């Protein structure tokens, strides 16, 4: 045996928490307290190494974690390296072509190899301390200090299951080499065996660790390569610490490895089995499978295969045992000054690497005469096959019906199609141009956008989230038919199609960007004047139904503040919106102008946009009759032009703060609290409307509705066609804060946006990025976006590629949350994720956004299916299925037209959503397949009943027979 302790294997003098040798035997990796992963060459520590090139020792340094690296584990194929850290993140690394880079300022040479992160797994809410790959490398298990074990699919990086059963920190996890179970060990002094078929708890073992003392960094248990033994850590049998061994099936401790003077931290089985003498494969078949320990009395003991295991302890020693002997084969003392925390065997089975908290690594190279002769892989596979059967291709679950398999196929195609569609949208965004010409130049010639279908009307003042308008999701669905044992048919959808990226781009090219959504720093030009902004819209004509509207407001501040009026301001307790931020100087404000553009798509393509401009002008005393001295007045000139042609103009004796307009009217809000409405030709449609305070936000829809928010926090919505006030409300309900509820002084609340949502209801966004939608039916504000779910897995994953309002609001929330303190590590992310999805589902329904509603619904159903939450899944399915019904016949057909249940939601058929989206998403977890089959049967019966009712409705009724008297008269006349 050769032992070595290379001094050059280090992590800047800090602890080394994990070590693992690549299955190919070319590299080994270490993770340490310096937040780095280092990949080393095995040639430099090989026992037959004669010429060591120091420049080739360290192959790469990975610096992508932001916390201590607790665990590194190679996949069995050696391509991927998984790492877990204190930053609660798991990363999957892969080698890429070329050489690596060096850390700036470190003075280190560039890496020899180039390793990059190919997948980041987020979901844990505390430190990730142990990892283990499945036998086929398709799944990764992770144990964390959040008391859970997460199961990750390597096909897509999604967490497929969260195992909750431990009441304390999970510090070790290991995978059954057969693939049927997972074992985890926790500080609650229990070991839990989990089934991989449905991720249920198979057995909880306790009692063997109840007398254990102290605490350890890890409890890294291990499964034997034969699949029969689990060696655990941190056991105690007076007067020694032990490593209890559990036997498969009964899951009870049959014997212990005794001898350490401190708690056992890590155990590691050799990858293969050994025998004392060389033998042929025929001897291996005849011999028992070698599950017995040293007390075995088998007659063929000399040829019986046995396991080799290494144990590391807090007593700074390492012991190596075989299951063919009751005494340790090897004891390593005085190699480390602190606890041993991780072990790794080489692929050939004759080298052992160990790392310690003292920041050092030791290597032990054994001879065949010491450990025995290693079984070939084919022999080991034959041993497992004789005991467990053929484990190749063994499925984790068993489908109970052909429908389950067909729905799983539909779900897989659905997920793949959605993923490809998202990637295409991300890689090929639609081209959108924003026209912001310099005010010193003339308005450029611009082509009017092409006429869009009537169902795709947009306002020219639409925000940036309108650019990527989601295309229609529905498409022809291929179906598969089969017959059940009772002879009835069942229709199974194959997949749900998604539109191509080309369609989305074509529909998005003609949509403009609302200049009011641009950053305030972009609004003022370099010379201090306000540039003109053009927003392309879809003004069809001057009728009542098809309009386009845009808005503008002056750049007084970056945001507006709502706060309670001071005591000196009056006792009415009214709200006031005050200007905050950088106020434009008077000289600058006096020369700045505000302008908007409106296009008319009814005109030819070369027509120029209509421009409305409000420009401050000053009149001196010499220009006014009857006034002397240096007195001057400030006015605002309103000019409407098309190119160089002036359509109309007017003057207002006040400073203009906001502008809005469409093909029907123009609206001008002033600082003195008046609102002037003009017709499209420039006539004053009505006397000036006095609001009592300056207008700070204004917006209009495609028809005749106008929204206005004043500085005092009052909101008005008028229908200018009928000259009625549709809504008059205050933003007072948005001001209430926790400090006010506690009786403290109320802080201010900044409003950054107030406009019409796409559904036509007013939408207000605060500086905290909380968004509120006014529900005219409930007559109250609905909070549709907030930061109440920081631990949700979907807190920042809703993208705006679908062009939805809710997606954009969610992204703003995510950016705002990034600046806030992190949440508690003990937060239950599962509960928050479910609550967040339910909130998003209700918010998309309130916004009347069918695309986002369907997206949230799919995510919610997949989450419930992953958690096997049958009660909520049943409730959702029942709401989409309709009212309960028994055997459908003509007498009960009236139930299908029950007015209390709407068969549609946001223009989508509920039964179609149930058949094409909900049921295929439920098929991802076979644990709920019985519930799935139940609703498939019910849906088939409902659709059959609906078909019968429709056929009855279209059956023509026979004409009534002629009256008897008329018939007799005709007969007499004929005679």
From Swiss-Prot:
Q: Where is the composition biased (Polar residues)?
A: 435-445, 499-510
List the PROSITE patterns hit by this protein, alphabetically: WD_REPEATS_2, WD_REPEATS_REGION
Coiled-coil ranges per the record? Answer: 923-954
| Entry keyword annotation includes Magnesium | no
Q: Which Gene3D superfamilies match?
A: YVTN repeat-like/Quinoprotein amine dehydrogenase
Q: What is its main location?
A: nucleus
Which is one Pfam family of this protein? Hira
Which spans does this entry mark as compositional bias, Low complexity?
418-433
Basic and acidic residues bias: where? 478-492
Q: Where are the WD repeats?
A: 10-50, 64-103, 123-162, 165-204, 214-256, 259-331, 335-374
Q: Does the keyword Transport apply?
A: no
Q: Where is this region: Disordered?
A: 418-510, 948-975
Subcellular localization: Nucleus
Instruction: Please tell me one Gene Ontology term that the record gives under cellular component.
Output: nucleus
* UniProt KW keywords: Chromatin regulator, Coiled coil, Nucleus, Repeat, Repressor, Transcription, Transcription regulation, WD repeat
Signal sequence extent: none
Can you cite a GO biological process for this protein? chromatin remodeling
In UniProt terms, what function does this protein have?
Answer: Histone chaperone involved in maintining knox genes silencing throughout leaf development.
> Would you identify the family this protein belongs to, as annotated?
Belongs to the WD repeat HIR1 family.
Name the record gives this protein: Protein HIRA
């Amino acid at each position: 045996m050769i032992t070595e302790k290379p001094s050059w294997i280090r992590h800047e003098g800090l602890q080394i928490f994990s070590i693992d040798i690549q299955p190919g035997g070319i590299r080994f990796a270490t993770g340490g307290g310096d937040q780095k992963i280092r990949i080393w060459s095995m040639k430099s520590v090989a026992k037959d190494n004669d010429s060591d090139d120091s420049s080739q020792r360290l192959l790469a340094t990975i610096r992508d974690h932001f916390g201590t690296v607790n665990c590194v584990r190679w996949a069995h194929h050696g391509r991927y390296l998984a790492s877990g850290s204190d930053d609660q993140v798991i990363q999957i690394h892969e080698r890429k072509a070329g050489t690596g880079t060096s850390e700036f300022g470190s003075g280190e040479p560039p890496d020899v190899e180039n390793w990059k992160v190919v997948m980041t797994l987020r979901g844990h809410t505390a430190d990730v301390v142990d990892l283990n790959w499945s036998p086929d490398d398709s799944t990764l298990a992770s144990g964390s200090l959040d008391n859970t074990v997460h199961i990750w699919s390597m096909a897509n990086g999604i967490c497929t299951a969260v195992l909750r059963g431990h009441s304390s920190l999970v510090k070790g996890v290991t995978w059954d080499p057969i693939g049927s179970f997972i074992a985890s060990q926790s500080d609650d002094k229990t070991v839990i065996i989990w089934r991989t078929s449905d991720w249920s708890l198979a057995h909880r073992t306790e009692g063997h660790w109840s007398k254990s003392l102290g605490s350890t960094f890890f409890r890294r248990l291990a499964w034997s390569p034969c699949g029969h033994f689990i060696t655990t850590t941190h056991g105690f049998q007076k007067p020694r610490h032990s490593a209890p061994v559990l036997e498969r099936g009964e899951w009870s401790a049959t014997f212990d490895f005794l001898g350490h003077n401190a708690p056992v931290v890590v155990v590691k089985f050799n990858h293969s089995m050994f025998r004392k003498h060389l033998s042929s494969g025929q001897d291996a078949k005849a011999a028992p499978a070698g599950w017995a320990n040293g007390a075995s009395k088998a007659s063929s003991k000399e040829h019986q295969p046995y396991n080799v295991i290494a144990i590391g302890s807090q007593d700074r020693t390492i012991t190596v045992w075989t299951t063919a002997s009751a005494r340790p084969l090897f004891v390593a003392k005085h190699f480390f000054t602190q606890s041993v925390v991780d072990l790794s065997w080489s692929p050939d089975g004759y080298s052992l690497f160990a790392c310690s908290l003292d920041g050092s690594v030791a290597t032990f190279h054994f001879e065949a005469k010491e450990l025995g002769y290693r079984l070939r892989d084919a022999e080991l596979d034959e041993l497992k096959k004789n005991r467990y059967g053929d484990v190749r291709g063994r499925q984790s679950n068993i489908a109970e019906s052909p429908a389950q398999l067909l729905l799983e196929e539909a779900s897989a195609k659905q997920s793949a199609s959605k993923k490809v569609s998202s990637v295409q949208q991300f890689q090929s965004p639609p081209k959108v141009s924003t026209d912001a010409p310099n005010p010193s130049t003339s308005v450029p010639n611009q082509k009017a956008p092409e006429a869009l279908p009537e169902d795709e009307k947009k306002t020219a003042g639409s925000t940036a989230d309108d650019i990527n308008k989601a295309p229609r999701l529905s498409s022809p669905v291929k179906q598969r038919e089969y017959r059940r044992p009772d002879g009835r048919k069942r229709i199974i959808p194959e997949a749900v199609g998604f539109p191509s990226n080309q369609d989305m781009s074509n529909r998005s090219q003609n949509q403009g960007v609302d200049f009011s959504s641009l950053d305030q720093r972009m609004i003022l030009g370099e010379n201090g004047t306000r540039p003109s902004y053009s927003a392309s819209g879809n003004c069809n004509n001057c009728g009542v139904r098809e309009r386009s509207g845009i808005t503008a407001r002056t750049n007084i501040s970056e945001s507006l503040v709502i706060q309670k009026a001071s005591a000196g301001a009056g006792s009415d307790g009214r709200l006031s919106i005050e200007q905050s931020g950088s106020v434009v100087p008077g000289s600058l404000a006096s020369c700045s102008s505000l302008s908007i553009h409106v296009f008319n798509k009814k005109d030819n393509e070369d027509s120029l946009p209509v421009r409305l401009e409000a420009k401050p002008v000053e009149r001196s005393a010499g220009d006014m009759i009857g006034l002397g001295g240096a007195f001057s007045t400030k006015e605002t000139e309103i000019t409407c032009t098309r190119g160089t042609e002036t359509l109309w103009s007017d003057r207002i004796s006040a400073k203009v703060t906001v502008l809005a307009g469409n093909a029907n009217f123009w609206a001008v809000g002033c600082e003195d609290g008046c609102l002037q409405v003009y017709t499209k030709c420039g006539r004053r449609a009505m006397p000036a409307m006095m609001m009592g305070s300056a207008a700070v936000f204004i917006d209009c829809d495609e028809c005749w509705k106008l929204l206005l928010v004043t500085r005092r926090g009052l909101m008005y919505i008028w229908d200018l066609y009928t000259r009625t006030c549709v809504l008059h409300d205050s933003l007072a309900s948005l001001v209430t804060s926790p400090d006010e509820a506690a009786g403290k002084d109320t802080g201010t609340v900044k409003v950054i946006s107030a406009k019409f949502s796409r559904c036509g209801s007013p939408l207000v966004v605060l500086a905290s990025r909380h968004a509120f939608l006014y529900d005219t039916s409930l007559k109250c504000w609905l909070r549709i976006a907030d930061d109440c779910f920081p631990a949700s897995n979907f807190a920042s994953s809703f993208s705006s590629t679908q062009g939805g309002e809710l997606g954009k609001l969610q992204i703003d929330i995510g950016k705002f949350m990034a600046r806030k303190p992190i949440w508690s590590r003990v937060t239950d992310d599962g509960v928050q994720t479910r609550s967040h999805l339910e909130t998003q589902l209700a918010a998309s329904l309130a916004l009347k956004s069918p695309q986002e509603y369907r997206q949230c619904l799919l995510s919610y159903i997949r989450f419930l299916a992953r958690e096997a939450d049958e009660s909520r899944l049943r409730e959702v399915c029942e709401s989409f299925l309709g009212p309960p019904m028994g055997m459908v016949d003509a007498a009960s057909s009236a139930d299908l037209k029950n007015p209390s249940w709407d068969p549609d939601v946001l223009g989508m058929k509920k039964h179609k959503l149930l058949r094409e989206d909900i049921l295929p998403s439920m098929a991802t977890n076979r644990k709920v397949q019985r519930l799935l089959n139940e609703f498939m049967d019910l849906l088939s019966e409902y659709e059959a009943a609906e078909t019968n009712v429709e056929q009855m409705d279209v059956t023509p009724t026979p004409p009534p027979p002629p009256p008897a008297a008329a018939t007799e008269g005709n007969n007499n006349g004929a005679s």
